[in-house]
Amino acid sequence: MSMFLDTAKISVQAGRGGDGMVAFRREKYVPNGGPWGGDGGKGGSVIFRVDEGLRTLMDFRYNRKFKAKSGEKGMTKGMHGRGAEDLIVFVPQGTTVRDAETGKVIIDLVEHGQEVVIAKGGRGGRGNIRFATPRNPAPEIAENGEPGEERQLELELKILADVGLVGFPSVGKSTLLSVVSSAKPKIGAYHFTTIVPNLGMVRTKSGDSFAMADLPGLIEGASQGVGLGTQFLRHIERTRVILHVIDMSASEGRDPYEDYVSINNELETYNLRLMERPQIIVANKMDMPEAQENLKAFKKKLAAQYDEFDDLPMIFPISSLAHQGLENLLEATAELLAKTDEFLLYDESDLVDEEAYYGFAKTEKDFEITRDDDATWVLSGEKLERLFVMTNMERDESIMKFARQLRGMGVDEALRERGAKDGDPVRIGKFEFEFVD
């Protein structure tokens, strides 16, 4: 049996852009040929694509690092470097992608073929042909390629099912799924026979169809991790209707009503929204002795908890083993699904700010200035650091261009206001230079 994995932590890194080239046209009969260095190619992006054929996150168990290729360097004759191909990473339907640092949801991938650029490749550096001006017709300036985005991610798979079967172990969930669909879950006369979610397609006699999931049995304390705990409670979150399966024969020696209350408490503790979903009570094993009497007692206790009869959940007595009462249950489930909307899985507070995450939002500050214990002024900030890494520090003209960019951003003036003096050390990343006033 293939292993089921529904969570994974991975890192993704997009490719770096290729460096621009400094080159000059030197041909016979072409005086003053001018700059001829081309741009670097763009780095490859990391793209997640949904594949309906995948059922688990098992592929990410041993392969946790995904790195796209970098773009090629620019060439002479003004030719651009080749851009790198994007790296496509396939994920199953129902995969939620979170930022590992903040826990915020980046995207919920639910449609087959759906794609998202999860880490954008760096743009290629410009060659010196781009920097020619009337004042400087032969520039010795070219940019380094921009680094690709790098992210730490958490993947969480929540299977796509319209209906979820919940209940204590050995109440007959797997048997029910096996007789109403073509699914073949493992069935046994012991607890936790089902240790992975099973999914089956159900078709009613009236022609309606829906996906039903058999989830591993819950026990008291599951929401705190007891038994299989929260490992599989997450799979209930996408369902629109819950079928609460109860062993009405009390063959395990437990009271059916106490089972019902206990499981609902676990659902509510795990996620308050789960109790917003409509729930049908499936009174299973009605072909067993004591089941009828237990059902009467169950209904009496249940009614005592409701003020109005209309509020009572629907109860369907069935026997999965004897194939009794199944048609009525499935028809009622289909009708309930037809009038039940999708439930929002996440609040806005759970989601990343897309503009900020993907770099579209304008920040108030382009840079920050701090001072180390050794009296070195430290410059930081996303825009400033990006300009720095794209500057070729081996060429004087590139360094002078970077200095002009810093002045244009107001860095020099800000350093003076903070008290920087001529000759003070200034650091950007690992590069250190002296402040010139």
From Swiss-Prot:
This is GTPase Obg. Signal peptide: none annotated. NCBIfam families: Obg_CgtA, Obg_CgtA_exten, PRK12296.1, PRK12297.1, PRK12299.1, small_GTP. It is found in: Cytoplasm. Keywords: Cytoplasm, GTP-binding, Hydrolase, Magnesium, Metal-binding, Nucleotide-binding. The keyword Magnesium applies. Residues 359-437 form the OCT domain. It comes from Streptococcus pyogenes serotype M2 (strain MGAS10270). Disulfide bonds: none annotated. It is an enzyme of class 3 (hydrolase). Residues 2-160 form the Obg domain. GO terms for cellular component: cytoplasm. An essential GTPase which binds GTP, GDP and possibly (p)ppGpp with moderate affinity, with high nucleotide exchange rates and a fairly low GTP hydrolysis rate. Plays a role in control of the cell cycle, stress response, ribosome biogenesis and in those bacteria that undergo differentiation, in morphogenesis control. Residues 161-338 form the OBG-type G domain. Its cofactor is Mg(2+).
